[in-house]
Amino acid sequence: MASNLYIVHHEFRAGTSSKWWKTAYAAMAPGGGWDEAVGANKEKGFFNHSANAVTANGPLYCIWETKEGISIEEFQEFIDGPTGPGFGLSALMNICKPIDTSLMNGQTPYPRVFS
C-alpha cells in the first residue's frame, strides 16, 4: 500500500481572508516557524506539496499527501485543526477529495514523500 494524495479545496469564511493572509505571511517569514511546522506535520504523516490561490479571497487548492494508514477522517481532522492550513483561525472551509492515481495508471501530481 502507498501513501494517499488529496486535492483540498479551501474557501474563506466571510470576512476572514485578510487575517488568514496576514497570519500565513507572518508564518512564512524568516523566524515565523514555517519550517518547524512543516517538519512537525511531516512527522505526523501530513505533507503539503503545493498551495494554489485563485484570488486573495479564494478559493485555494492544495495538493496534500498522507502517509500510509491515515484515514480520510483523520486527514480531514488535521486539515480542519490548529496545525493545519487554517492556523487555528477557523477561516477556511475545507473539502478534501482523495486522488485515485489508479485512474491515471499510477501517475501522481508530485513524487511521493512517503513511500
Locations of the language-model features?
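A common structural junction motif
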Residues: 79-90
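Short S/T/G/P-rich N-terminal loop/turn motif that feeds into the first structured element of a domain
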Residues: 1-59, 65-77, 96-115
